[in-house]
Amino acid sequence: MKKVVIPKMGMATTEVDILTWKVKEGDTVKIGDIIVEIESEKANVGIESEYNGIITKILHKDGETVPVGEAICEIDES
């Protein structure tokens, strides 16, 4: 099981808002697929999957504020 985390987006950014999930639990994703749109202080950004697999768990809902470095979903690579 792999975890997708919020990447560091600049020196001042400590948290981001989840705008819209582009996937749901059970969806198959490939490396490079946009899985979620987030908003930082400066921009809206699409977070790409770093793994091929199935989304097994979404850990934060649309509208939630999430600290940089925190896991937002889990992907099963098997």
Task: Kindly label every feature range from the protein language model.
Residues 53-72:
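PDZ-domain C-terminal substructure recognizer with occasional recognition of PDZ-binding tails
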Residues 1-35, 46-52, 57-59:
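Acidic, low-complexity mobile loops and tails
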Residues 30-48, 67-78:
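Short hydrophobic beta/alpha edge segments that flank linear recognition/processing sites
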